[in-house]
Amino acid sequence: MTDCQLAAELRGIIRRRRQKLGVGAQSRAARELAKKICILPEYQSARRIALYLSSDSEIDCRFIIKAAWRAGKQCFLPVLRTDNPKAHQMDFVSFTPGSPLGFNRYGISEPTKGAKIATSALDLVIVPLVGFDRDGHRIGMGGGYYDRAFEFTRMQKNGVNALNLPVLVGVAYHLQEVLNIRPKPWDVTLSSIVSV
């Protein structure tokens, strides 16, 4: 079995685990996640935060978004580029309480209007994932969108953010943790992972 086949099989297993969580458990986890994120020094000092709107039983970020708005922080959401769908690229667009939403080609909610921000101008990025390990490696949905958007962060060495790059924090349920993920050369390593 190839690495790609193994990753696809692992994605399926973890997604099925996630989908078995009841609505109540998902809501409690989302609230607990918001509490954990909001006490992080990286969150407290951040002015521009990228998040996501959950789909496919991903852990929900809406409580983090609401807390960020109350704290006067700017929120941004990923929007898939439509000019070349095969390129698997995305931009981040401002997200406010009144932002109109639509669905992208994967059925995920995203803003239909808003100001774009350069990924390098973000302070904190809350990253969705399917699986993770303790070394900050993640398995995403397989499209490579986050790896492409944040490939410039590979300059970070030994956890030092000397170039004032965005801090990438993966968020997940505990049940999404796996023992070891073999990263590919293009994979972006997360700064940390917060799980509940």
Task: Label every model-predicted segment.
Residues 62-69, 146-151, 190:
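Short amphipathic alpha-helical segments and helix-helix/interface helices
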Residues 142:
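Short polar/charged helix/loop
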Residues 60, 145, 177:
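Short phosphate-engaging motifs
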Residues 1-5, 9, 16, 111-115, ...:
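Surface-exposed, charge/polar-rich loops and edge strands
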Residues 2-121:
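N-terminal active-site beta-alpha-beta segment that forms phosphate/nucleotide-binding
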